[in-house]
């Protein structure tokens, strides 16, 4: 072919197949040309691609390492603090089958957070404080205050030159003259309680955890290492051959202006792997929060009201009685943000038995953190507790303000042999469309539970089996002889009977009929079917929804040895929980 129609593939084929003539020099030339062509077309591009790929991978890895390294705090602020979340130490149970890997005698769960106070003059924090103050002003409509922090203020942007007055004036000028302001004391309380939301978390901080033995003469110390996550939190599960009595936490990072690193020591809490445990919700279960009320009231309950105003009558007595009488261990699990830990710890320690507190880590909008919650968030920490104590029986206590019933039902299904009872506190305005009917609806759902969940107990207590009467004695075949007096007595009785024959005597009352166990659905008529007003005057959608939810939980728990009860008076739940514990121990 001519030069314009040069076929590279045919040339390559000819070169690889050998010279067409018998000249040996021609063969060497073709082999040399073929080597050059192969080197240029195949080897060099592959080598270049390989080098480029490795170079880019190296650049990316170097960049990533630098980016991660830049996240590490080279020097922590002098006011950095360690917040320790008390958890527990427990005994590792021996696997009877020997299938699991050998473990040490004790396991300790360590939880803490590293942070330092936020800059009060930063734009974000000034905006947040001003927004909270306006939101808490009496008389301000909720629509007047949009509880949203602008996206560019979600993260602390540092110390900016914007004056605080310019921001506060933009927020409060509309209501400056129309609404009353917060008192000085309330403002001080707000500033104190909101500090957890203003603080700065310290991520990627190396931490050293030392577990110290109870017996100082042993001299054993176990050290463990970890790094805080993106929220500044640390979770370590440490196994030891000895029972630790103290936990020493050290930040392995230089501190600004200090030669020694920050180090604090906390007590270790041992919890037996056996016995009874109680997992309790916090909001509207052991403290007045008002999740079912308006947002402003709930916000004031959390950030303004006195801590002792949170106490729900009867609940502290219930918990303390179980702790003192039945040696029950307590665990507190809530959707409250972890930034409120210090305040909740103060409240629980003053009114309830001590125990670890598990709160939720939130991020993003401050008001969304406070106002929103989901019972599903509590399932995982509850499951972790049950896994750590597989031989322990538990009581779950929640409230009707959230979906605690569904969360606890799911937990009982996942751990069928560990849940003794579920108690749901009836909150105000949560079970009926008419607030005054909450108690009535609660009694109705308890009746449904009684009929459905305890049919055997009801049958034994209300329906008694009758014994067959003994057979009559066999009459004697010998005819008895009567005296004259007996004969006269018989004659007189017959005459009296004839005289009174006209008088009808009322028949004796019929014996009580034995009623079969009736399904609770027999008594449940949804208000949606109440078209003619036969069962009520209005449609109570909340009540119908609660009956449906309760029936669904009862059906799921039909094969479980788990009792369910709604309560408004903690004295009734105290009595029932003591009975349930005694039944379990007596078996």
Swiss-Prot record:
Q: Where is the composition biased (Low complexity)?
A: 9-22, 163-174
**Statement: the UniProt record of this protein carries the keyword Hydrolase:** yes
Where can the motif DXDXT motif be found?
A: 281-285
Per UniProt, what is one GO molecular function of this protein?
phosphatidate phosphatase activity
Enumerate the InterPro entries for this protein.
APP1, APP1_cat, Mg2+_PAP
Role according to the record: Mg(2+)-dependent phosphatidate (PA) phosphatase which catalyzes the dephosphorylation of PA to yield diacylglycerol. May play a role in vesicular trafficking through its PAP activity at cortical actin patches. Can also utilize diacylglycerol pyrophosphate and lyso-PA as substrates with specificity constants 4- and 7-fold lower, respectively, when compared with PA.
Q: Relay the domain remarks.
A: Contains one Asp-Xaa-Asp-Xaa-Thr (DXDXT) motif, a catalytic motif essential for phosphatidate phosphatase activity.
Q: What is this protein called?
A: Phosphatidate phosphatase APP1
The species this protein was found in: Saccharomyces cerevisiae (strain ATCC 204508 / S288c) (Baker's yeast)
